[in-house]
Amino acid sequence: GAMLAGLLGLSCAFAAAADQGGITLNFKDADIREVAATIGQITHKNFIIDPRVQGRVTVVSSRPVSSDAVYATFLSVLEVHGLAAAPSGDMIKIVPSLEARQMPGYPYNSSTPGDAVVTEVIQITNVSATQLVPVLRPLMSTEAQLAAYPQSNVLIVSDRASNVTRLMDIIQRIDQSTD
């Protein structure tokens, strides 16, 4: 934990490792502003962050993903935390979304890790990620986000940690080789 905390203290850029096949995300309880800065470097997008934007996020991808998938993942993270990315000229403003007031507050500092909101990028191998969306959606909480990124056949899931763990188990069972 101390090494990770030190790493995050220096720069979140180390938490996103570039690879020939793409980028592997590994943010654990990271400041959302630092995550935004790193996503900006990866995607070459410029963000203006509203002073009200704060909180800690966990984003993990099991395999390297494209920079487009990284941005799609970041948008899901924002949405699940009641935030939105609003393009403004060459910049993208990160602000509280209008829906944020109606959403229940997320426990950023919850003592129960299963209650923390996490985002997972899940590589699907044997079935279409898009086909999994209608199967998984009814199993998710109302605040959760689920998106398929067909170009690299990945699912992006944002929900409470306990639900994401359960969904990953279900996905693993569905995504079996038919051989």
Predicted regions and their residues:
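Sec-dependent N-terminal signal peptides of Gram-negative outer-membrane/periplasmic proteins
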Residues: 7-179
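Bacterial N-terminal signal peptides that target proteins for export
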Residues: 1-5
